[in-house]
């Protein structure tokens, strides 16, 4: 079976082609209810539609750019636009309508933009200020703005009501056939036996169908609500906005035309808009148009489209068009209907259901044929003249109903749906544990993870950074909480240079918030440096206003430094500042400021002193940054790059980023669970090693290597080196990508990778599970990731792994349980039909059994919470079989036991219990049915553990399991004792009840004994 499944029902956890997804669906030939079976599979037609939309967008944008360029050449000769403001827009106080705004940005219409007075003109017409943003003082004006220009939300499919799920559950082909059987049974029964005696069989089937439908619909409806809640969490995106004169964080769904949005590397453009100011802005439009070539956005080409990504630079943007008025809104509405890819387990279990369904269908046909043949043989024995009565018709109908119900029981439609149920349950619980699963498959894949490649900053450490040591002007000092002593020790000219560098060469900002308090905005590293500047007496706004910024090169993981070129107020001199990785920036310096504040050549002795200082700081687990400047003598153009060499070193700062509490224990837990943790960081190797030792990642037999050294290795050297690598420092994004790819392809590892920046995208994409940071992560990283770690904590990653293992094992438990029921129900009814000419389990009884094993069984077993024992096992890995030898052992062992018990009852039951009289067969069949159900109840308990003997451990922690077992027993008593007329049962004696329970219970020690058999 496994080889057939691997060749036909094997999909990747990520990036499966549409052809592969189509293939397995076409192989699912025995499907009772396609609407329900394929509800949680991707809608491929909607994906094709979205791809076509991207191609259309690409062509429209290409034409718009060409037209815009042509128009720009003749713009001075064109007469003013005859655009007229609609009356309702004018009455609301605005001078431009939403359609006109949309046509300007979407059409890249430079001509129209010019006619409306450029970006400043449009800002005025929208009653907004480029500096202060929107004013929302008047609620009426705000609601008018929303009414005229729309809100920044995309069209979503309506929440389906409970009755829709009831209707879908009724689409089950076998239930429909049984419904027809029930209807015919009612007609024939009433015609022959009268009302109400003749209606019992038919009404029994109808009641069973309705019960199955409502229980199924309730389960599906609850799942849909869980997925809806998770979907809302996925869409929570915030941006930095200036509104009412204050910079603040705001949900993208609250944005309105006229808002001023601040964008930086890794952000997603939240609406259509226009560039106000900024530097080196490069936009990736591939998500909208499919075009891979990045676009430079400047004052000359100011158009920013919703859904595109900031690849480089930073800027302020004026929002012009929102929501469904943008091309991104229309694309997202289509894509949301495309759905998630199916998970590998869902597809594999669809394969299992198909195989067993075909077997079950064959058994059902043969069973029906044998039962009908038996009936004909009885007729023949009565003589050549046949007489067909209403009872004969009812008997034939009952045979057909039994055959159909065998298909109901034999086609384990619940297998793939149990995966969805388990994943929905796990994802909901993981949200409480600060992990947001974006793709279903990631949850189950994480259970197989063998390696975690983790960032250092913010994941293993707290990301609360402070400068604790410095070496300014060759003078090493501890930085106290109040830096007055440091300030007095720095020469005045050097202090001025230092503050100029800190406040101009930064991606952060110091603002006054709505409460009138000073607030630092930016990354933790930027915040630490800005705090140092403020403590040294610097004033952010004064410094920024006194210099004119000419060029900014933001920090990225490849260069490992950032730079700025400014024009000084005195004499228009040009100065460049840079800061970044100490070794890299120091290598770009040829001069240094000494303790007297003089600029002197950087000789060997000074270089040695500074390198020793860097190593000392790093060995104390401090992140080190080197700060440097240079005066540019000749003229400098914004089109030029910032010089690479010739800088003067001002100093080095050591930033403390403490290790998170509990990380060492989590790393040790991973090691015991067979998961190798590797640190991949851009930091200095000594800093990385110190932190790695503190976390327990770097062991005596492990290797710490620098990225530049790693990338020089050939394939043969890598094969020997990679298994031992525990720390990679000074790594570039491509080093990370190479390591992940080698681990996956060469060493067959299942790799989870953390990332927070735009440059982590290749590694996140390549990994089996991409983990993005919720706090420090950029929108680009979050969008490409499979799981978002909301608290940026490594311990949460371990929790995700635990939940992943729990999902995988829970599904295995359910599959083991359901296949046991399938095998026994099939063989019992088939063999009984062949040997005795009758079936001991009726259609109504089989429907009840089907509900026990399908919906209720999935609820009980697929929602088991994880326990600590899960992290003491080795991971399944990439090549592990889903249906293991241990599972087959348990399935076949239990099936044989149950089959023997039922056959003993069929053969010797009447004599064992002294059953005589006309109702002896009914009592015996009721006893067989009762024993069969209790075998399933106790087997469900035994299935809680596939290898362990103690199946009661933690049973009370899973209240769903307890409720399901209790409800099953309760309704079984009701069916036997009170619903005999409809279920073809009769009340049992106390001895017969105890016997049924004992037979079921006896399956537990047998299950325990089976677990002792090695496989």
From Swiss-Prot:
Bilayer topology: Multi-pass membrane protein
GO CC annotation: plasma membrane
In-chain residues carrying the UniProt-annotated modification Phosphoserine: 45
Catalytic activity from the UniProt record: Ca(2+)(in) + ATP + H2O = Ca(2+)(out) + ADP + phosphate + H(+)
Coiled coil ranges: none
Cytoplasmic side of membrane: 1-161, 222-349, 418-811, 863-882, 940-957, 1012-1015
Membrane-crossing segments per the record: 162-182, 201-221, 350-369, 400-417, 812-830, 842-862, 883-905, 918-939, 958-979, 990-1011
Residue numbers on the Lumenal membrane side: 183-200, 370-399, 831-841, 906-917, 980-989
Entry keyword set: Acetylation, ATP-binding, Calcium, Calcium transport, Calmodulin-binding, Ion transport, Magnesium, Membrane, Metal-binding, Nucleotide-binding, Phosphoprotein, Translocase, Transmembrane, Transmembrane helix, Transport
EC number per UniProt: 7.2.2.10
Modified residues (N-acetylmethionine): 1
Main location, first listed in the record: membrane
Residue ranges of the region described as Interaction with calmodulin: 20-31
Regulation: Activated by calmodulin.
List of catalytic residues: 455
Biological processes annotated in GO: pollen development
Annotated positions binding Mg(2+): 756, 760
One MF term in the entry's GO annotations: ATP hydrolysis activity
Subcellular localization: Membrane
Role played: This magnesium-dependent enzyme catalyzes the hydrolysis of ATP coupled with the translocation of calcium from the cytosol out of the cell or into organelles.
UniProt family annotation: Belongs to the cation transport ATPase (P-type) (TC 3.A.3) family. Type IIB subfamily.
Domain notes: The N-terminus contains an autoinhibitory calmodulin-binding domain, which binds calmodulin in a calcium-dependent fashion.
Protein name in UniProt: Putative calcium-transporting ATPase 7, plasma membrane-type
Record organism: Arabidopsis thaliana (Mouse-ear cress)
